[in-house]
Amino acid sequence: MPEGPEIRRAADNLEAAIKGKPLTDVWFAFPQLKSYQSQLIGQHVTHVETRGKALLTHFSNGLTLYSHNQLYGVWRVVDTGEEPQTTRVLRVKLQTADKTILLYSASDIEMLTPEQLTTHPFLQRVGPDVLDPNLTPEVVKERLLSPRFRNRQFAGLLLDQAFLAGLGNYLRVEILWQVGLTGNHKAKDLSAAQLDALAHALLDIPRLSYATRGQVDENKHHGALFRFKVFHRDGEPCERCGSIIEKTTLSSRPFYWCPGCQH
């Protein structure tokens, strides 16, 4: 599943294609959304927001399209009139004079009013987004030490969208390697220095991945700073200590770590 940096990059691509342009055609696959088609023609997308792995497309009439890609959903940008060759099922089409954005295969799609936006169950549940520029290491540290999270093992906590939205497995693996910890630690047991390092890494690594065009299927980004230090590198030497990186399973997900420098 794409993680926060990939979702934000997808949002950037959608904004670049149609933001501020009048919609000339709107189509939804689901019957409960059909009534919104005519309401949106002539309106425009004001901005595309991410909340962890959910995407919010805001329209000029106050409505917001909520979509969560889950495992299979994918957005595409095409020239208007172009019909991509794909076996995927089209769910949403938002068309402008020159560009069209298409959502395929997703099933978790809703139209929300401003009031519904504040009460939506998923949006209520997710924690602060790691890519929100207003989120600080101090706030992250407070969350780590809060009664709700301080006794949770990092193996599960760093996958829990209620803790911080936008984290996922490759980020969990890279963050824990960066701070030299294994997944069985809890925030309540860390030293002040370890807590500080973790709070910074929880923001720095997702933001670096986003800023340097972090693609999960590329091991190295040409000319960029972000690359996987342990993710998908089992059997290779750790660049920090030389020990061989191992692969195991933590919280039902593949976990990569260095037994030499993660304790």
From Swiss-Prot:
Residues annotated as the enzyme's active site: 2-3, 53, 253
EC number: 3.2.2.-, 4.2.99.18
Protein's UniProt name: Endonuclease 8
FPG-type ZnF: 229-263
Gene, per the UniProt record: nei
Keywords: DNA damage, DNA repair, DNA-binding, Glycosidase, Hydrolase, Lyase, Metal-binding, Multifunctional enzyme, Zinc, Zinc-finger
Source species, domain of life: Bacteria
Family, as annotated: Belongs to the FPG family.
UniProt organism field: Escherichia coli O17:K52:H18 (strain UMN026 / ExPEC)
Alphabetized SMART domains for the sequence: Fapy_DNA_glyco, H2TH
Reaction(s) this enzyme catalyzes, per UniProt: 2'-deoxyribonucleotide-(2'-deoxyribose 5'-phosphate)-2'-deoxyribonucleotide-DNA = a 3'-end 2'-deoxyribonucleotide-(2,3-dehydro-2,3-deoxyribose 5'-phosphate)-DNA + a 5'-end 5'-phospho-2'-deoxyribonucleoside-DNA + H(+)
Textual note on the cofactor: Binds 1 zinc ion per subunit.
Cofactor: Zn(2+)
Entries under PANTHER family matching the protein: ENDONUCLEASE 8
InterPro entries, per database record: DNA_glyclase/AP_lyase_DNA-bd, DNA_glyclase_Znf_dom_DNA_BS, EcNei-like_N, Endonuclease-VIII, FPG_cat, MutM-like_N-ter, Ribosomal_uS13-like_H2TH, Znf_DNA_glyclase/AP_lyase
Pfam families: Fapy_DNA_glyco, H2TH, zf-FPG_IleRS
Function: Involved in base excision repair of DNA damaged by oxidation or by mutagenic agents. Acts as a DNA glycosylase that recognizes and removes damaged bases. Has a preference for oxidized pyrimidines, such as thymine glycol, 5,6-dihydrouracil and 5,6-dihydrothymine. Has AP (apurinic/apyrimidinic) lyase activity and introduces nicks in the DNA strand. Cleaves the DNA backbone by beta-delta elimination to generate a single-strand break at the site of the removed base with both 3'- and 5'-phosphates.
A GO molecular function held by the record: damaged DNA binding
Binding positions (DNA): 70, 125, 169
GO BP, sorted A to Z: base-excision repair
